[in-house]
């Protein structure tokens, strides 16, 4: 019985590993979710009451080659293919490599991230803290009309707005950008009185749509006050997709799309209300700096690889 059970588990893991590898080679943006599913099955199977100690030990030996060795091999293969494809077109994979190519002017550039089968336009910040930042969100006072951030799941998935003004780059793209490198998220904030603050989240990661664009990071630093940790390990919520911990929908209540908990200490995709506002927590809020009744003038969210050296670029 033990042998049959082990054989069945081995065959199942081999099948799932093949699926994972196929997605990697195809460049499917959900490949990380598929592989994490393979890995997480160990925990599920461990909970089965009739799983013997012998089967557990053998299953543990299977986990490493399937979820680490094989995945690493095919990830390296696919990465090399994609990099060669991008290099043939002269396109960098993010704004850090745009910087590495000698560009020092902030603006719109074309990049070709790994795991995407097409290039995209992004705004690169080449000035803040040494440059090399790929901007994923911006709020600001750009006059009329004001960009509406009270959007649907599909809109946040694909992105919206104007790269030279207010925009959300898109959860699918953010997923790709945060999975091709280990990155730091920087949030730059400004109020209407001229005050400025920043926050950084190290090892910032957004998972795939299958995992509801769950966000996580390891450590926080900055002078804005920590309004991110409450949202750590939370999935994304919009007015039409409620994934938060509140009995109601945080996005619907606070007029945005965000990694709401129950509900928020930051709401950078809230309503653009220009300073103090009466209705609590519906604006572009950063609670640990200006509270729930002050909507900020500027918010910029940007990412770059952790290994980037300010003023020097990426290690050669």
UniProtKB/Swiss-Prot annotation:
GO biological process, one term: fibrinolysis
Signal sequence interval, chain numbering: 1-27
Keyword Transport carried by entry: no
Tissue distribution of the protein: Hemocytes.
Keyword annotations of the record: Calcium, Disulfide bond, Glycoprotein, Lectin, Metal-binding, Secreted, Signal
Subcellular location: Secreted
SUBUNIT field: Tetramer.
Name under which the protein is recorded: Techylectin-5B
Species name: Tachypleus tridentatus
